[in-house]
Amino acid sequence: MECFGRLMAGLAPWLSLPDDNTTEGTHRKQLREWALKSYVNAVDPKSPDYLLWRQEGQTLVDAAYIAESFLRGYDALWTPLDSLTKQRYINEFTQLRRVDPSYSNWLLFSATVESFLRKAGAPSDTYRISSSLRKIEEWYVGDGWYSDGPNFAFDYYNSFVIHPMYIESLEIITEAGKHKNIWNMPGCDYQKAITRAQRFGMILERLISPEGTLPVVGRSITYRTGSLQTLALLAWRKWLPKELTNGQIRAGMTAVIERMFGNDRNFNEKGFLTLGFNGSQPGISDYYTNNGSLYMASLAFLPLGLPADDPFWTDAAQPWTSKKAWDGDDFPRDHRCRLGRWTCESGCGPAPLPGR
């Protein structure tokens, strides 16, 4: 479940592109058909591919990424499923209320599952959504960063989980709130959350070195390019702030991906990711890490959901900030983000409500 959910959460936008006659389009159509069959088998108790839905704890984490894949590819991956399969997912997601999430980013796993149930028209637990999002709002520490629980940690969980799932859950309840006021979430605001993510994206872009590396800090570093997810989300959803151009983000992210995967160290003889950061380095794995965990790396590929003629792909490549700085070229100054009025000293601002 861990491997499947994380992989699909990263690939859902690409699989949602319309069919075409290109080689890539043909390949994508085949993979989408296989994905849909996999979704069916994943909740069929009679299938050998039936996933471990009824386990404790970690199942909530892994199921949240499956729910996120449905949110990101609703029309292509959820809508085509037959009614029995949909009901099985609703039942399995509902069963996850037995899991008491830890006081950390895990709250967003509950919120994501329940937000998907609401989008799908199934009964959802309003309290599990609102209490989780209120707590995430309380944990905002400033300048685009949230703490992961009561204490701040300098790691990539703002990109692995917090910014994306907070925004995606807020998007669902913002849409629901248009019809009736059922939410008690002072301070939680969809546009403000996007503005914070824009600021975090600006910082993340500056962390990309001229050589295409990122600082190796924090836990779960084996998730590799999953650290780029917030930038990937901003690019895919057309939320990049004015300081970040399509050309520089594409070039910077590509540099990191090529530096990471441009060798043959990261896959074993069967083609699966190895435990490690850049190669087989099992000693850096955390106690909760297994080979399925590593497919968080696919979350960097969200921009593949943009069509080939999108400016993200067609704009000329440009140097990213650190490359300009270390090459002696002009580059913009950096300032902290003030969000009292949803503005940022660096210039990022609220995005349109809601949508692509």
PLM regions: where:
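N-terminal domain-start signal
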Residues: 1-23
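Short amphipathic alpha-helical coiled-coil/interface segments
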Residues: 35, 197, 201, 253-257
